[in-house]
Amino acid sequence: MANAGVERERKFLVDDLDAALAVAGPGEHLVQGYLDQAGDQSVRIRCWPEDGRAVLTVKGPRSGMSRPEAECEVTPEVAELLLAACGPRVVDKTRRALDVGGEGVDWIVDVFHGRHEGLVLAEAELTTDGAVIDPP
């Protein structure tokens, strides 16, 4: 199944992991590889090893806080081939939803592992153009 739409997001570096995890839901492990990145456009494969899901995503150029995005599910076999094609451009992380308020904003926190150990990012996904971001 494929879908296309508009992505609206902002990312923030997290200084206090304990505070972020205090308002976070259960985590899900994922592996993400970048097949191509040119400027602010990218093609990536994201895999959830625990349940075998995998999604290929193409993100277009930014316009303000928005950019076009298209996603399509792929089989685990295709995902494995695509991840291998990423070479060293692969990240391993645990993603958790943050239980914080905010009309029209969904928050997540990514805790990175491996060579990016110690990196923690919070991401605000805006569901509407007029959503106001108030970092927790």
Role assignments for model-derived ranges:
Residues 1-136:
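Phosphate-end processing signature that detects enzymes handling 5′-triphosphorylated RNA
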